[in-house]
Amino acid sequence: MKLDPNEKWSEEKDPRGYRQGDAIPEGDPVCIVPWTTICLSANGNIKPCCAYDADNDNKHFNFYYGDTLEDAHLGFEWLRKAFANQEKPAQCNQCWKNESTLSNSRRSWVYDKIKNKPKSYPVESPLKLKHMDLNFGNTCNLKCRHCGSWGSTNWFKEDIKLNDINKKFKRAVNHAKVRDVDPNYWIERQHYFEDMERIDFKGGEPFMQQGHYDVLKMLIDNGSAKNVELGYVTNGTKNPEELEELWPYFKRINLNISVETSKPGLYEYFRGGKIQNIDQLEQSIYWFDQFDNVNAHFSIAISTYTIFDLQELGDWIEQITSSTRSFKTLLANRTSDHKNRYEKPNNFNSVVSDPAYLDPNNMPPHMKQKVLNRWNKNYHNMEHLREAMLRTEYDPEQWELFKQYTKELDRIRGESVLDHIPELVGEL
């Protein structure tokens, strides 16, 4: 269902309640994030949510520069006012773009996840968190091609080299340093978690960050774990035994395993090394499937590198979900009407838009047609992806940047994209 401001959700239309993908109910702000949520990014930026464009902001708040969550919450008063007035600020363009492309967005996700919503939305609002995106740093064992130093310590050297080659690659060289939040910061501020419904851990790779385990132990010790849902975005390379002791204390574990392709060879190429192949990822999935309180999904960031094999990834997900308990949510044949929707679909719900040269919508028409010629199934959101590709005008500059970026990174890593994506033969 497309997010349409003229088609507001109501209990009469769907008595099962609001679900992600519905339009925000009439009378509520455009987005409830700055009243309920806050995000500490891996680079230390304090933002309303992970989709917020802090680089487009007049005032930055950063944990490593001494800013506090209170400072940021007060600083976002203008955003609460804008949302209360039904405005759509430029800093939130990712939501508006995702809604037009995928009929989904972060603001819709938050509205779905926060169950005990505020009764009112005053502009001058106290910091009373229901949800937190908590990232303890950028430590990661992979260097995926759509990532950078902000999200992986393995990107540092290559980011510097790419930045020297072409500044238009927009590599995050200012983040090429190890970030590591001291867990004592949170342990000394347990009042932040008094009304918490959900905490999402990302990264870096969250299972490689000791602070994450320390916070879980804190929530168990103070008795609040039973009321808190945990969310993760993990690359699936780590299966920490410590989780077997900690996770059962929590209300629910929402596990999102990132996977962009299931094609052997391309999987390793995209992730930047031989640390794990697709068969090993499957074994990791079966390990996570042992937990009774885990709801598991796949986090899929669609880029020019992976869009050609998107339908095959859908087939792979169908095969995995048919043989697991926690991943018992099918991707195929999820219809757009409320009556027949699956409760927890594994959908294609994210397109890489930054950097823009990795956005498949910026490919030339003949390349888009190559993609569309491969699709003959109607996995959820593929119809929206198809519409967006046809609707979005080709950007020659971004396509040239994609080709240069790919060739230069291939040279640095000693690889060739043509070994894995034959559709690009003759293009580079």
Describe these PLM feature segments.
Residues 186-192, 217-223, 246-248, 288:
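Leucine-rich repeat
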Residues 129-139, 148-181, 194-210, 222-241, ...:
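Core AdoMet radical
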Residues 2-18, 51-99, 292-295, 338-344, ...:
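C-terminal accessory region of radical SAM enzymes
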Residues 304-320:
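Catalytic cores of alpha/beta
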Residues 211-217, 240-247, 309-313:
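Distinct, well-ordered alpha-helical segments
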Residues 2-29, 34-37, 45, 68-135, ...:
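N-terminal [4Fe-4S]-dependent radical SAM core
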Residues 31, 49-50, 92-95, 140, ...:
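Short cysteine clusters
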